[in-house]
Every structure is written in structure tokens, then in C-alpha cells.
Design a protein with these regions (language model features):
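N-terminal beta1-alpha1 ligand-phosphate binding loop
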Residues: 2-27
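Short, surface-exposed acidic/glycine-rich loop or hinge patches that mediate macromolecular interfaces
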Residues: 8-12, 37, 54, 58
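FMN-binding flavodoxin-like domain, especially the glycine-rich phosphate-binding loop
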Residues: 16, 24, 28, 56-186
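A short beta-strand-loop structural module common to alpha/beta enzyme folds
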Residues: 28-40
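Conserved hydrophobic helix-helix packing surfaces used for dimerization/oligomerization
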Residues: 3-5, 32, 80
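Conserved beta-strand termini and adjacent loop/short-helix elements that scaffold enzyme active sites
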Residues: 6, 35-37, 83, 116
Length: 186
């Protein structure tokens, strides 16, 4: 099964989430391609798509929204998972889903949408964004919950390869029957 993981990220934090998800899917024995949304020319070779975007002011990055618009008909015929990254703080705020997420789930027939907390590193953003985040007292830091992200990746893998075919081994998932490294067990 061929899976596309495509992520729109402004500062790299959301892209890192996509890379972790792609790695989990590969470890489950799936063929995974990663690409920026604007670089994808077609979906003919993919059976499933994981589409993610950073969220700024409650909105997805333009290239992710454009991807969803451009390939809406193709996405509606595939297994699709959506995720957003952007709420920050402890607890992450805002707590509500990005406004367009539920509409996208419905329009694309996506299996699910998940929101994950993000990261704010003021050294990586522009002067205007820095001023706004300071004025709004937005906390700086990395608030991503890697355990929750990996668990969701495991769920996607199980959906694609079958729940009885995926087992956790040494912190990664492998297709059942895969050989364990020397000294390991499945």
C-alpha cells in the first residue's frame, strides 16, 4: 500500500510531526512518500493520504488548503487522515479545532482529524509575529505531545495494515511476523 504524507509547515515543527508519522507507517511495512503539498502533482500512485498543516490565527497554511481544494475529488476516493498543529501553551490554547477542519473532514470524507499542540520559537519567526506573540503573552516552547502523535500514527498504521498485523517492538511498530533484531522479541 502506498501512502502520501504531505505537510504544510512554516517553521518546521509541523513537518517534524509528519516525519514521525511517516516513519511509523514505514515501520509498519507501508510504502511512504513525503512531500510538501505544493510539490504533489497527482495522487494516482497513492492509496492513502495523511495531510497536515500548521495553524496560524485559526487557519491552515495556504498550501495545505490549496492541496485539499486541488485534489478534493481524488482525496474523496482514498483513505485520508488530517492533522493540525498549532495550539501552544500548557494546556495548549486554543482548545477548539481549527474552524475549517470539520468542513474538510466532511468534504474529503476523511477518516479523522487530530489537533496537536505546536512549538513557538521566537528566534524562528519574523519581527511582526514576534511582536504579536509577545503582546498576546503567547508562551514560548515546544508543546508537542510526541506520545500522542506516535499513538495516532500507530492507529493509522493499524487501520491500513490491519490491527492484528501490527505489533509494537522496541518503541516502533512492525508488521506481525517481522524478524526482531538480535536479542529482541516480537
Amino acid at each position: 500500500m502506498n501512502v502520501l504524507v504531505t505537510v504544510a509547515s512554516k517553521q518546521g515543527a509541523t513537518e517534524e510531526i509528519g516525519q514521525v508519522l511517516a516513519g511509523i507507517l514505514r515501520d509498519a511495512g507501508l510504502s511512504v512518500t513525503t512531500s510538501a503539498p505544493e510539490a504533489v502533482s497527482g495522487l494516482d500512485t497513492f492509496d492513502a493520504v495523511v495531510l497536515g498543516s500548521a495553524v496560524y490565527a485559526g487557519r491552515w497554511v495556504g498550501s495545505a488548503s490549496a492541496f485539499a481544494d486541488r485534489f478534493a475529488a481524488d482525496l474523496a476516493r482514498r483513505e485520508v487522515w488530517l492533522f493540525s498543529s498549532g495550539p501552544i501553551g500548557d494546556p495548549p490554547l486554543p482548545t477548539e479545532e481549527p474552524p475549517a477542519a470539520s468542513a474538510l473532514v466532511e468534504r474529503l470524507g476523511a477518516r479523522e482529524h487530530r489537533s496537536f499542540a505546536g512549538r513557538l520559537d521566537r528566534d524562528r519567526i519574523g519581527l511582526m509575529e514576534r511582536a504579536v506573540t509577545r503582546a498576546l503573552k503567547v508562551p514560548e516552547g515546544d508543546f508537542r505531545d510526541w506520545e500522542a502523535i506516535r499513538a495516532w500514527g500507530d492507529e493509522i498504521a493499524a487501520d491500513l495494515v490491519g490491527p492484528t498485523k501490527v505489533v509494537r517492538m522496541f518503541g516502533t511498530i512492525r508488521a506481525a511476523g517481522a524478524t526482531a533484531p538480535q536479542g529482541g522479541t516480537t
